[in-house]
Amino acid sequence: MARAYVSLGANLGRRDANLESALALLRREALVEVVAVSSFRETEPVGLVDQPRFLNAVAAVETDLSPRELLERLLAVERTLGRTRDGPRFGPRTIDLDLLLYGDAVVREPGLDVPHPRLHERRFALEPLAELDPGLVVPGRGPVSALLAELD
């Protein structure tokens, strides 16, 4: 069984309800156990900044799914909650689920990059990761605490 970390974000609709709905759907997934959830944080948008503020969190999950299978489940949850991908990249969204880490695996495949390739640049993901596991190490990058310090 692997420990994976999934980021959750929303900036459209009832953001808190969107995150809670995503967590509820994840909890119903076979072979996925949500073992911890960070606090919810309001954050500024990244990339396309002229949009509403985000509500972000990270969930720690235990899973027997492969990284690809877990990603497919995350995308299915997004679709169930009305996520469409026809808008601008980094644009507003009802829900956004990203696979940040999958144990100590490093995966580079079409459509799947683990650890998330921009994780080390994203305070909105690093802070909740540090809340869940202060000693967590991002493969190929180093401790989450050091990555956060580099952003200061």
What spans do the regions from the language model cover?
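N-terminal beta1-alpha1 ligand-phosphate binding loop
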Residues: 1-32, 37-42
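Short, structured patches in soluble enzyme cores that scaffold and shape functional sites
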Residues: 8-10, 63, 130
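Flexible, gly/pro- and Lys/Arg-enriched active-site loops
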Residues: 31, 46-54, 65-152
